[in-house]
Amino acid sequence: MANSLSVHLVKELREKTGAAIMDCKKALEVSKGDIDEAEKWLRQQGIAKAKKKSERLTPEGVIASYIHAGDKIGVLVEVNCETDFVARTPTFKELAKEVAIQIAAASPRFLSKEDIPKEVLDEERQKIIESLKGQNKEDLDKVVQEKLEKFIVDSCLLEQPFVKDQSITVRDLICQRIAQIGENIVVRRFVRFQLGEEIEN
């Protein structure tokens, strides 16, 4: 890569991913200047770093709030990190806000697939089977599994496509920020309010 092109690509990749300059340079070297491949490489590195940091305690963080336009939907979400210093950074606060907006827009019921009670999965599986009565039995198991996977993705915050970039999940977004910041980050809990929900006539 010519030096001017390299600087331009590093800047573009950094703007797209938020990764450190040295990481962007390394990604472009590995991918021989292909920015899409460099972005994939950074994502994989982020996941690897996130796994290494996932056991670290996260006693600090913020509670972010978001009120949707029209004041009909409100969200509170607790996002934790390791240090108060990181909790006060714009990057971390922006992540917490993005997660709150995701919750408002996509209405997740659970944090992750591990949080879905067995009875909820069993009930959903039964509903799917009932809706597929009369289908070819050979295909039934596959279709049921596919529909159940879609239910899990739709219902779980961390599995949902990120509303601002559908090519990644919320889990991927958090992994990217872990790699960028260098600390473990955990979405601890959230609550979503919608005006008039669960009000009986």
From Swiss-Prot:
Region (Involved in Mg(2+) ion dislocation from EF-Tu): 83-86
Subcellular location: Cytoplasm
Keyword entries, A-Z: Cytoplasm, Elongation factor, Protein biosynthesis
Family matches, as InterPro entries: EF-Ts_dimer_sf (IPR036402), Transl_elong_EFTs/EF1B (IPR001816), Transl_elong_EFTs/EF1B_dimer (IPR014039), Transl_elong_Ts_CS (IPR018101), UBA-like_sf (IPR009060)
GO MF: translation elongation factor activity
Record's GO cellular component terms: cytoplasm
Pfam families from the UniProt entry: EF-Ts_N, EF_TS
Similarity field: Belongs to the EF-Ts family.
Function statement: Associates with the EF-Tu.GDP complex and induces the exchange of GDP to GTP. It remains bound to the aminoacyl-tRNA.EF-Tu.GTP complex up to the GTP hydrolysis stage on the ribosome.
Protein name listed in UniProt: Elongation factor Ts
Organism listed in the record: Methylacidiphilum infernorum (isolate V4)
